[in-house]
Design a protein with these regions (language model features):
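Structural transition elements
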Residues: 272, 279, 305-337, 354-364
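Gly/Pro-rich hinge or "lid" segments in bacterial periplasmic/extracellular proteins
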Residues: 62, 150-207, 211, 221, ...
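A structural "hinge/loop" feature
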Residues: 30-46, 68-70, 95, 139, ...
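Extracellular/periplasmic solute-recognition and catalytic clefts
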Residues: 126-127, 185-194, 215-275, 298
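Detector for C-terminal structural segments
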Residues: 188-191, 197, 290-318, 360-370, ...
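Aromatic- and charge-enriched surface segment that lines or borders ligand/interaction sites
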Residues: 71-115, 128, 134-136, 226, ...
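Surface-exposed binding/hinge segments that line
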Residues: 73, 117-162
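N-terminal lobe/hinge region of extracytoplasmic solute-binding protein
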Residues: 27-76, 107, 119, 177-178
Length: 512
């Protein structure tokens, strides 16, 4: 959408005031494959799943706070956990939520979640009685509690999912019977998902909204105009930097970024290390040395930060690592590796894929394409998939050379970083898509996740960052400046640690 058209919309149709029916309309750029975060990651699944399902905990300003579990105890070794569930909590069909459901849910996520490495150490999950659950791990897991939020490990109804149907294709992933603040009222596939307030929700007086409608705009250019005209109230994970400048000039609209500070979104190039070209760490090093990350960050709109290693800047676990920008040495490396330039100056051509709805990725790819061909004579042919599913099939099957991706570091490396490089998450979407495998790196990740001393843990993650950077496992590029664009009268979304990936039971409209 052009700036001129948006400017016209700004003055012709200001955003609406709070609605009479106490509802919220959230814009989506595509329809999610399902609503169950135990079997699929991604912002679309998680923002709806976090409303339909509860977790044992939710994230507060200082870490995990009670949610479905009203309290818990953890032993001094961080290996034994006991959870006490709230009395009277029910699923949306009225069935009581018990410790058996929680045990079932943890096991389901352990087997099926794309980030299953975060639960690898869980050894025993034992219901003591209907409202008490014991969990044991094989090694200390000081960060384990952070995993049990609804966007990662939702509490599922065992009486529905335990019917023998494979959970990753279960019809309840769309026709959800949840445990959270909102119940599924209706859906029109490809168009809308309507959630209604669940009157039996276990937190008194919550949720405060009566309805949330998720409306799909297949043309992302329609979303800014919908926000301006009041046809949508909120759009999360926006990277529409040009439009944001116009949004900020409208007093009825607010643009915020702080809610993504714990998600640590970033962009990287993932090499298929089974490809003969990218099997060589030296070739990967040459590509890294041919890109000036600072210049890239300045060229990409939106205020991104350059990134040189596996953990994004801004994370408390980030440790500075860098690869020097040295195109001359990059060319010498490629010469030694047996990739001379041909008569047209090209060393080799590879295809680079990207998730087709990720417009931010495409803007970076075009920059990288010009830099690679100019500095080292490597041609990256951009391949656009017909739809996100086609891209996902291609990268998980290994039928790709390089793919561009946008990932979240999440609030702990054991959740958001380990899964990208762990052997046990290879060929899983938004996890280890590169098929990288290194037993020493796996062991370092296990040691880091088990370290109870924060400084000792930070030192182990520093060693991991140095090791992965030395191998140039991926080409880390920059942070992503996601923003939430919303009607200014929508309250208690931006103050949630993960924004719309948190339960919106507190969200409400400002009233006169």
């Amino acid at each position: 959408m052009s700036a001129a058209l948006l400017l016209l919309a700004l003055y012709a149709a200001p955003a609406s005031a709070s609605p009479e029916d106490n509802s919220l309309i959230v814009a989506l750029e595509r329809f999610p494959p399902g609503f169950n975060p135990a079997v699929a990651s991604g912002s679309l699944t998680s923002q709806i799943g976090a409303q339909l399902f509860a977790g044992l905990v939710r994230t507060g300003k200082d870490g995990p706070i009670p949610y479905l579990a009203e309290s818990w105890e953890i032993d001094s070794q961080a290996k034994r956990f006991r959870f006490h569930l709230r009395k009277g909590a029910t699923f949306h069909d009225g069935t009581p939520i018990t410790a058996n459901d929680v045990a079932f849910s943890i096991r389901a996520a352990q087997r099926h979640h794309p980030f299953r490495s975060m639960l690898e150490a869980v050894d025993k999950v034992v219901p003591v009685d209907d409202l008490t659950l014991d969990l044991e791990t094989s090694i200390p897991q000081p960060a384990l509690l952070k995993c049990f939020i609804p966007a990662l490990v939702p509490v599922l109804p065992a009486h529905i999912y335990g019917d023998g149907t494979p959970i990753d294709t279960h019809p309840a992933n769309l026709r959800a019977v949840g445990s959270g603040p909102f119940r599924l009222a209706s859906l029109e596939k490809g168009k809308t998902i309507v959630l209604e307030r669940y009157k039996g929700f276990f937190l008194p007086g919550k949720p405060r909204l009566d309805r949330i409608t998720f409306r799909v705009y297949w043309d992302q250019n329609e979303i800014p105009l919908a926000i301006m005209q009041g046809k949508a109230d909120l759009y999360a994970f926006s990277s529409l930097s040009d439009e944001e400048r116009i949004f900020r000039s409208n007093p009825a609209i607010e643009v915020t970024r702080d809610e993504f500070s714990l998600l640590h979104p970033f962009a990287l190039l993932t090499f298929n290390v089974r490809n003969p070209i990218f099997r060589s760490p030296e070739v990967r090093k040459a590509l890294a040395m041919s890109i000036d990350n600072k210049a890239l960050a300045q060229a990409v709109p939106g205020g991104v930060r350059p990134m040189y290693g596996p953990i994004p800047p801004g994370s408390e676990w980030h440790s500075p690592v860098s690869t020097p920008y040295d195109p001359d040495e990059a060319n010498r490396i490629l010469d030694r590796a047996g990739y001379p330039r041909n008569e047209n100056g090209i060393r080799f051509t590879v295809e680079i894929d990207y998730e087709p709805s990720a417009q931010f990725s495409l803007s970076i790819l075009k920059y990288l394409q010009s830099q690679f061909i100019r500095t080292i004579g490597v041609y990256f042919r951009i391949r656009t998939a017909e739809d996100p599913g086609s891209w996902a099939d291609r990268v998980t099957s290994g039928a790709f050379d390089v793919t561009m991706d946008e990932l979240y570091g999440w609030h702990d490396p054991a959740i958001g970083i380990e899964r990208i490089y762990a052997t046990n998450t290879a060929a899983i979407l938004w996890s280890n898509m590169s098929h990288y495998s290194n037993p020493e790196v796996d062991a370092l990740f296990r040691s880091a996740s088990a370290e109870k001393d924060p400084e000792g843990r930070k030192a182990l993650y520093a060693a991991l960052q140095e090791r992965l950077s030395r191998e140039h496992v991926a080409l880390w590029l920059c942070t992503i400046p996601y923003a939430t664009i919303r009607n200014r009268n929508v309250l208690h979304v931006a103050d949630q640690p993960f924004g719309v990936l948190s339960p919106l039971d507190e969200a409400c409209w400002k009233r006169p």
